Amino acid sequence: MPSRNSINKPKDKLQRNSHASSIGKKRSARARNGIVTKSSTPRYETDSNAAPKATESKAIALYNGATTPTGVIINNTLSNKRSKKIARNKKYIAKRNEKLNIDLLADQEQMEVDEETEKEEQTKAKNQTKLDKIKEVLWAAVEDRVSEGLKVSSGTDGNGTTLGVQAF
């Protein structure tokens, strides 16, 4: 006698057989009476008269400009989802390229401005007097001193600063 959890119990076998046969009868009745659909035909049957499923996606043919001169027919297709994704990516690429072109033009304009300022500085340097040159050197020294910031002299042992022992 089979165990309590066995799948080979006679009662379970009878129930499974009757269930499978009733489903098979319903399927064959639908095939005889109803419209032929993809769900009512076997998976690998290539019946062109079968109506498409409600959830079946519509494919879009993929064309890349001119046709190939070899005359070979290619049946590459795209789903709606994939075609929308490609269109969206093309839009993003176009925006990015436009932004890069704007940046490139701005850089070129800035380079032109730099060339003009260099010419102005050269003409200004030619017209400077000795007094102007001395003023420029002194102001450069002051700016260098200010940009160095505050220097803390730590002494020899570093006491009283955070460099040595932290005792206040």
UniProtKB/Swiss-Prot annotation:
InterPro entries referenced in this protein's UniProt entry, alphabetically: Ribosome_bgen_Alb1
Role according to the record: Involved in proper assembly of pre-ribosomal particles during the biogenesis of the 60S ribosomal subunit. Accompanies the pre-60S particles to the cytoplasm.
GO term, biological process aspect, one: ribosome biogenesis
Broad class of the protein's primary localization: cytoplasm
Subunit structure: Component of the nucleoplasmic and cytoplasmic pre-60S ribosomal particles.
Subcellular compartments: Cytoplasm; Nucleus
UniProt entry keywords in alphabetical sequence: Cytoplasm, Nucleus, Ribosome biogenesis, Transport
GO cellular component, one term: nucleus
Biased composition range(s): Polar residues: 36-49
Disordered: annotated span: 1-56
Superkingdom assignment: Eukaryota
Family, similarity comment: Belongs to the ALB1 family.
The keyword Cytoplasm appears for this protein: yes
Upper taxonomic lineage: Eukaryota, Fungi, Dikarya, Ascomycota, Saccharomycotina
Protein's name according to its UniProt entry: Ribosome biogenesis protein ALB1
Pfam families cross-referenced by the UniProt entry: Alb1
